[in-house]
Amino acid sequence: MRNSIENSIENSIDYDAVVFDMDGVIFDSERAVMQCWKELAEKYQIPDIEQAVLSCTGTTMKRTREIMLETYGADFPYDTYAKESSAIYHSRYDGGRLPMKPGVVELLTFLKEEGKKIALASSTRRQTVTNQLRDAGILDFFDQVICGDMVERSKPAPDIFLKACETLGVKPEHAYAIEDSYNGIRAAHAGKLHPIMVPDLLPETAEMQEKAEVVLPDLLEVISYLKGDRHGI
């Protein structure tokens, strides 16, 4: 892993595409979801909710349900709580009110100006993804949108990243993946993409330092990294 941009120009193969995760990378949604669950935890006296929610980061709704039941037991009323949490979330953030992470538009604009292909690979359902990107005014930046309900295996399996590269018509080895979650970095690494970790709620770990090509603090630093790495991966 490289954790700075100074030595990035040593590479020589052009990159063709960048594949983005959505929650925690484009939108500050994971923090919003966490807050909703914290409110439910206080209301219903659910213990250790923060760690439980963090364990679900980067997974599909199906896997999230499984993790919650594994954590709290088969009689945990997850469906009821999830419905209430979702209602709180949508009442606050629908209609373009979900805040974007700093540097999103700048990075997307840079990639378009560079002629790079752009895809989104999110474990979230397609309709939700499309609505959020459209409401934020950035849907048209993406050449392809691949979602969790379009692949058989969720992250950390590489399926969603491989499908994104396939639909873009690029080799995984010639694509960056921008992720904030451990499962996302694992998936991109397994798929032979070049993972860039931009941590959100989850801090970098020794495993992430090993699997990510670079760990950067925000998307504006990703622009600097790609400019330094203009000639390739």
What are these regions, as identified by a protein language model?
Residues 43-46, 71-76, 113-114, 137-141, ...:
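Short helix-capping segments at alpha-helix termini
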Residues 40-41, 60-75, 132, 164-165:
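Helix-loop "lid/cap" segments that line or gate small-molecule binding pockets
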Residues 2-16, 109-112, 125-233:
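Asp-based, Mg2+/Mn2+-dependent phosphohydrolase catalytic module
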Residues 47-50, 68-106, 114:
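Metal-dependent phosphoesterase signature
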